[in-house]
Regions:
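Metal-dependent amide/peptide-bond hydrolase catalytic core
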Residues: 1-10, 179, 200-384
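A non-catalytic alpha/beta surface segment that caps or lines the substrate-entry region
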Residues: 25-28, 34-76, 97
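Active-site metal-coordination/substrate-binding segment of hydrolases
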Residues: 75-137
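Acidic/histidine-rich catalytic neighborhood of metal-dependent amide-processing enzymes
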Residues: 111-182, 254
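Acetyl-CoA-dependent GNAT
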Residues: 391-396, 400, 404-491, 508
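Conserved beta-strand-loop-alpha-helix junction that forms the acyl-donor binding cleft
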Residues: 493, 519-530, 547-549
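Conserved active-site alpha-helix within GNAT-family acetyltransferase domains
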Residues: 499, 524-543
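Conserved GNAT acetyl-CoA-binding A-motif
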Residues: 509-522
Length: 565
C-alpha cells in the first residue's frame, strides 16, 4: 500500500524516460538570451517546444505570456508559473561550464531550470490526462525580475482571477519554499536646486546635500520588527563637477515588508517627509517605479494544505523537506487578491543573480518527479473551504456531519469517545461500551464552543472547547478555556489543518475571554498531537502515570504566555 505522500511509480517512470529531454531542453533554454522586457526568444522557444510535444493549443496572451491549459472547460483552475526573464541583459555571454553534474551559467537556476520543470510537468499532464477536480493553467510568464513589476503574472491573474482557486510559482531553489510574500514599493526620488559655482555661490542649496538630508530622515523611520519591514537606498546619481553646487540629484529607494499595513505606513511617512522638505529653494519629486503588493487575508486552511502538500511531495522525491521562508515572487499578485499561492523550487543550486550561478544537474530527475506529482496533487488542496466559529452546535446538518466524523475517529482516541461519560471525565475505570455512545458524546459537546472547518460546505474537521473550566489537575490554571475534542477526517490528516484550527480557537478565546489561559489534555501515546502542541507553544504541566492503562499516561498542557519562564 502506498504511503500518503510517496511518489507513485508512474511519475518515476515518466521522469526516467524523459530525463535526457529535460537536460537537453535545459541546455538549449539556458543558452537562449533573455532580459526583463525582452523575452521574445524564449517565448518563441517555449511555444515551439510545447507544440512539438503535442500541446497544439499553446498560445500567448497580449503581453507575451506562453500559456497552455489542461481541461480549459473547467470553471475552477489552478495556475502554475515560471518566469522567462533573468536579471542579465541580452548581451550577457552565455556558456554552460560543466564540472561533472555541476553546471554554471548566468540565469541557469533563476529561473531557467524551473521553466524546464514547468514544461516537463505540462508534458506529463498532457500525456497522462489525470482526473482532477479543476483545470490547470501552465504559464511561462514575463517580467518577474527587477522593475518588470511582475507584469506577466499580473496579466494572468487579471484574466483568470474569477476562476482561480490556487497558484504555485516555480522559482528559486530546492531547500526552501515560500508561502509568505514580501511586498515592496520602489521610487526614484529627485531633488532640484538653483545650483551654482562652489566658491562664488557658496551657501546656495546643494541638491546632493539636500538628498542626503532626506536619506537621513528616511533612515530614522522606526519599522515594525514583527512584520520584517526594511528600507534601502540602492543608487544615487547627480551633480556636475567637484567645483559645482549640484543642481540635481536622484536616488532609487525602496521599502519592503510582509505586512500590507506596515507598507502603507512606510508610504505615508515618505510622502509626509518629502512634503515637509519642499521649499522655493529645493523641489523634490517622487516617481513610483515599481510596486509588488503584500498578501491580504487568504484561506488559512488552504494555505496550510498547499504548503504541507508541497513540503511532503518534495521530501518524498529525494528525502529532504524544504523549509518555509519568505520572498518576493510571482505569488505576490495572487496573495494580494486573497488567492492562496505558494512558491516552490525543484532543483539544487546557488549563486542567483551572479555570473557564478550554478545548478546541480543531478537533482533534475528528482525535481521533475516532484513537479509532475505536485501539479496533480495541489488541485485537491484548493477546493473551496472556510472556517466557522460558533458558540454551540444547533444546525441539524452540521450535527449529522460531526456525528459521522466522530464515528470515523472514535477508535483513534484512548479510550474511544463512544465509551466516555463526558469531555472532562477523570475516572477512566468507568468507561464502557455503550449502545450509542457517539450520540451521547455528541450531545455533550453540542453546548460547547466550536471551530468547524468545512470543505465545499461539509464539515471535515472540528474542535470544541469550554470556558471557565476548573479541575484539580489544572488547579494552577483556574477558569481556563479548556480544549476538549479535536477531530480531523482521516483522509485530510497531515495537511496542516489541525494547526489552523488551533490558531482559530486561540483567536476566538482571546476575543471572548481575554487573559484566560488555554488548557487541554491528551494521552501519552498520542505522538502526533504532542508534536503539534510543542510546535504551537504548549507546555506539559502535569502527567498522571498509567492513568488510562499500563504505559498510557494522561498528560495536561497549557498554552505558553510571554511571561512564562
Amino acid at each position: 500500500m502506498r504511503k500518503k505522500w510517496e511518489i507513485e511509480e508512474e511519475y518515476r517512470n515518466f521522469c526516467r524516460n524523459n530525463k535526457e529531454l529535460a537536460l537537453q531542453t535545459l541546455r538549449e533554454l539556458t543558452l537562449t538570451p533573455t532580459e526583463t522586457g525582452k523575452e521574445d526568444q524564449r517565448i518563441a522557444y517555449c511555444m515551439e517546444w510545447m507544440k512539438q510535444q503535442g500541446m497544439e493549443s499553446v498560445h500567448t496572451d497580449e503581453l507575451g505570456n506562453v500559456i497552455w491549459e489542461y481541461r480549459p472547460e473547467q470553471e475552477k483552475k489552478v495556475l502554475y508559473t515560471a518566469h522567462l526573464d533573468t536579471v542579465f541583459s541580452l548581451e550577457e555571454p552565455l556558456e554552460i561550464k560543466e564540472d561533472g553534474m555541476i553546471w554554471r551559467c548566468p540565469g541557469i537556476t533563476d529561473d531557467t531550470v524551473n521553466v524546464v520543470m514547468l514544461l516537463m510537468a505540462a508534458k506529463y499532464v498532457h500525456e497522462t490526462e489525470p482526473e482532477l477536480p479543476c483545470g490547470l493553467i501552465f504559464a511561462a510568464d514575463l517580467g518577474e525580475e527587477g522593475l518588470g513589476n511582475l507584469c506577466g503574472v499580473r496579466a494572468l491573474v487579471d484574466h483568470y482571477e474569477k476562476n482561480l482557486c490556487g497558484m504555485a510559482a516555480f522559482d528559486l531553489y530546492r531547500d526552501k519554499m515560500y508561502p509568505i510574500c514580501i511586498g515592496s514599493v520602489r521610487y526614484r526620488i529627485s531633488a532640484k536646486t538653483k545650483g551654482g559655482h562652489s566658491f562664488l555661490n557658496f551657501g546656495r542649496k546643494n541638491a546632493i546635500a539636500e538628498l542626503a538630508g532626506l536619506i537621513g530622515e528616511l533612515y530614522r523611520f522606526q519599522t515594525d520588527a514583527a512584520s520584517h519591514t526594511t528600507y534601502n537606498v540602492g543608487k544615487i546619481e547627480g551633480g556636475t563637477s567637484v567645483n559645482t553646487i549640484a543642481q540635481d540629484a536622484s536616488m532609487l529607494f525602496e521599502f519592503r515588508s510582509e505586512d500590507y499595513r506596515s507598507l502603507e505606513a512606510c508610504e505615508t511617512y515618505l510622502e509626509q517627509t518629502i512634503a515637509a522638505r519642499q521649499s522655493e529653494e529645493v523641489q523634490y519629486s517622487c516617481e513610483l517605479v515599481g510596486k509588488r503588493p503584500c498578501a491580504r487575508e487568504t484561506d488559512p486552511v488552504q494555505m496550510a494544505r498547499m504548503t504541507r502538500c508541497a513540503q511532503k511531495t518534495l521530501k518524498a522525491a529525494d528525502g529532504e523537506e524544504p523549509v518555509c521562508s519568505e520572498a518576493s515572487t510571482d505569488c505576490n499578485i495572487p496573495l494580494s487578491r486573497h488567492i492562496p499561492a505558494i512558491c516552490v523550487g525543484f532543483c539544487r543550486g546557488g549563486g542567483a543573480h551572479t555570473r557564478e550561478e550554478w545548478l546541480d544537474a543531478a537533482s533534475v530527475e528528482d525535481g521533475m518527479c516532484a513537479a509532475a506529482a505536485l501539479v496533480c496533487r495541489l488541485p485537491w488542496m484548493c477546493c473551496e473551504s472556510r472556517v466557522v466559529v460558533r458558540d454551540g452546535i444547533e444546525d441539524r446538518k452540521e450535527k449529522e456531519e460531526i456525528r459521522r466524523l466522530l464515528e470515523l475517529c472514535d477508535q483513534d482516541f484512548v479510550p474511544p469517545l463512544s465509551h466516555r461519560n463526558s469531555t472532562s471525565q477523570t475516572n477512566w475505570a468507568e468507561t464502557e461500551e455503550k449502545t450509542d455512545g457517539i450520540a451521547e458524546y455528541l450531545e455533550n459537546i453540542c453546548s460547547q464552543h466550536v471551530v468547524l472547518w468545512k470543505e465545499e460546505g461539509v464539515v471535515r474537521a472540528f474542535m470544541t472547547w469550554k470556558d471557565h473550566f476548573n479541575c484539580e489537575n489544572l488547579e494552577a490554571y483556574p477558569d481556563s478555556c479548556y480544549l476538549t475534542t479535536l477531530c480531523v477526517w482521516p483522509d485530510y490528516r497531515g495537511q496542516g489543518i489541525s494547526e489552523v484550527i488551533y490558531a482559530e480557537a486561540e483567536k476566538d478565546i482571546a476575543a471572548k475571554f481575554p487573559g484566560s489561559r488555554i488548557t487541554l489534555r491528551t494521552w501519552s501515546t498520542n505522538g502526533t498531537q504532542e508534536h503539534i502542541l510543542d510546535k504551537l507553544g504548549y507546555s506539559l504541566v502535569r502527567r498522571l502515570k498509567d492513568d488510562r492503562g499500563e504505559g498510557i499516561d494522561t498528560v495536561y498542557f497549557v498554552k505558553k504566555e510571554e511571561n512564562d519562564r
